[in-house]
Amino acid sequence: MKYDDLIQELNTWEYDEKIYREYYFMKKTPEKVKDFVKSHSDHELEVGWVLNPELLHQNAGEDEFISEKYNVSLVKHPRYLPVFYHEHDFFEIIYVLSGTCTNSFRDSTEKLTAGDLCLLAPNVRHGILAVEDDSIILNILIRRSTFMDIFYNTVRDKTQISGFFVGNLYSREKIRYLLFHTKDDIVIRNYILDMYREQKTSDSFSDRIICSILTLFFVELTRRHGKK
């Protein structure tokens, strides 16, 4: 698939997104909520999440979100899903392909716009909210061991990114996240779309190819946007 086709596919509305959007804009009167639940009775899970977002995973392990045969997983964050605070034991990249989102922490909130990229350390409590129709937010979930392998093999210069690696692997005072404003950097965008496309291929070679692309991604991110 071409890049434009991948973006068009990602922009397609999933049914759960339609449910979340409807609830976001509707008046929350008891009657309206009752009608809402009834009209989506065949999607109890999604309705439960939108009514009680605290039911979503608050503490997640790698194997809950990353398939056993993969080291990396790319997931589109649903538009209009109510914000829920959670943490997990793997690394995460939040990339804004288009539109905007907010990423909230215990003591601060970052507003991300198209091209922004947030590199998030494990066990950092946060919540994401994307409430614009044109928002496409990709979450890249990376096993801790995979992240370490990439660091040892590629990211060795004294840059902001290498400091993030070292701090989270060895230091008591960890860097919670790094924020990059890549703006309209097509190189960075295309590496992410390449990983997404390969995940769709899903054959016996896909995991190795995705990990290789991820390695190139981090090297290019360091070269093009890493602060020394």
What is each of the regions a protein language model found here?
Residues 1-100:
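Generic protein-terminus/edge-of-domain signal
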Residues 2-5, 109, 143, 222, ...:
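General structural signal for secondary-structure boundaries
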Residues 2-10, 58-64, 68-69, 131-197:
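A hydrophobic/aromatic-rich effector-binding and dimerization subdomain
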Residues 21, 79, 106, 125, ...:
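Arginine residue identity/basic-tract feature
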Residues 67-162, 207:
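N-terminal regulatory/effector-sensing and dimerization cores
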Residues 120, 163-164, 170-171, 212-222:
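Short amphipathic alpha-helical patches
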Residues 179-228:
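An amphipathic alpha-helical interaction segment
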